[in-house]
Amino acid sequence: FNFSKIPGSPVAYWVSDEFIAAFTEGEKLGDIAEPRQGLATADNNRFLRLWYELAAKKICINAHDRNDALRSEKKWFPYNKGGEFRKWFGNNEKVILYNITNYEKLLTMGNHLPSRQFYFQPGLTWSKIATVLSVRHDPEGFVFSSVGLKGFPSSENTKYILGFMNSVVCKYYVKVISPGMSIVSGDIEKIPLVICDKDQVDGIVSDNIRY
């Protein structure tokens, strides 16, 4: 086997020729899904709450981007922080204190708001700390964390990529590329994707998100 075709060149002697060929025939998820790491507050007790701890009128649930969020004059916004194994949709329990005053504080704390140009955009999210990858649709309006990682594929490919990332095929690639207890954005970037039967996959994924 030519293990050099696998990013990082792991010695995975059990993989097939087809497994290795996908790295040259397919597109890397890093090129079409833009996996990103989000923010770490450095003080979760101060900045985070469960959504049901607050009055609904204090939470902005439909911000399009950072400027839209700040104009809303709301203090709290949906926050994706990973969570338990769950596919397709869910784990939307946290909110973050993210008005202008606290935005400026967070710029100087934790990991200084990396990838903030992507905050509030729809995408796909998964938990960094996990032994098995489970990916969910993340709608517009969410800030995301350093342990609730997020990818940003084009709208026409979002459902297909979500289906692929929740498949046994993708889990097999993750096992080879990232055999540890964490699934970081750099590992996801390396996974190859070959698109086929797109309409059928999109339909199945739509049903899974809905139900």
What are the language-model segments listed below?
Residues S4, A12-Y13, D17-G203:
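Polybasic, glycine- and aromatic-enriched phosphate-binding surface used to engage nucleic acids
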Residues F1:
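Conserved P-loop NTPase catalytic core
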Residues D207-Y211:
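Non-transmembrane amphipathic alpha-helical segments
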